[in-house]
């Protein structure tokens, strides 16, 4: 099949949500609809308790982190879907943000009772950096929650994105009877389903169908009135606005009951964009170019000390990957033979034979690959848009054995290049300050320092609230350094960073130094 045809079939996306909105359940059920049924079945057997296919990022010491489930590829109708998992709860990390730089669209999952929550707002800000198209699924309609129209207002108000309802719920909680599809003019009646069957639910064609009155009684007339109101009061779906990231199509349902997801997946396959290409520092690389290009957005280490292998995740931007091909690792200027790339089809960690734009392949990495690295078939390219994000949590590294200082510095430098943490060295002392966006990142770093560098290290609280990279002309920066050097550090790449003791302090500094920029992201 031609490169163009294969590329057009690809849909690469991630799910953004607040913990407990149902992301894991939605992921599982999408796999079910994608025919990866063995995965939904394997969910219960993997551990004695009910653990889910995509929840892999617990520190699974005994057998290492299962890399396979961080990317799940499955076919649905005539498209091939690549779902990138975004760790949610306490294992939230900068990886979650960076994963969003490697997708072409995102699915926002919202709990009907809770509406828009903090984490969703943060993840949405990251999607905004690239105007990523967003689809929305409002989940848990089998429970009581906010009125649908109120939820749409909240999404529009808080996230500044127009909502276009595609499906509409008929009641909720105990009165939940199904959903109406505004564009297909069909009603799907609700039936709860067990975990392993895709729920069909009876389909009634036409809002004026008398069968609706038989099934729903007085609710049918209420539904007709409500739909008339909804059509008048809400936005009509515009594909162009969706692709620009200014409008989100909204679907309602109950993931735990496999209900409403088929409409969502159909909409996703129909409207979500295929891979188009990506901006590099010198030019725009189109997905249909013949030569392979790709970039690294994540590196995942194996937590098993016996297996030091790390896997670098590469998003293919253009061309076709074929097993055994040689690629240029642009940053180090070397050609490397990619003999054993990993592919992620239906949760089998297999060797990739071929892969196309939009696909993710795993490269075995022995410490030479960094986040943001570009691979090509010879051209000196550097893809942009894979940033470091300003950390939100900070700790100072304290050594138990001062003789291990060199090993600690080496370990922290390498781990920061890999994206496990960020390292800041204050100008005025020898402190090593670590930054992260999720608390588990510190535990992972401590464990890896011990296993891989034989360094025992404690992390203690430090008086830093937030960090910003400082950009400006040299004369202004020199003046700045002379005045505030006690709060200035260098990151692992040698870039200047202001480490603010409080948010208020940061605001004051920004006001006092209007010629300088204090930015929350920095390109790798």
From Swiss-Prot:
Chief place where the protein resides: cytoplasm
Ligand binding (GTP): 17-24, 85-89, 139-142
Pfam families: EF-G_D2, GTP_EFTU, RF3_C
GO biological process, one term: regulation of translational termination
Location relative to the cell: Cytoplasm
The protein's role, per its UniProt record: Increases the formation of ribosomal termination complexes and stimulates activities of RF-1 and RF-2. It binds guanine nucleotides and has strong preference for UGA stop codons. It may interact directly with the ribosome. The stimulation of RF-1 and RF-2 is significantly reduced by GTP and GDP, but not by GMP.
NCBIfam families in the cross-refs: prfC, PRK00741.1, small_GTP
Name of the protein in its database record: Peptide chain release factor 3
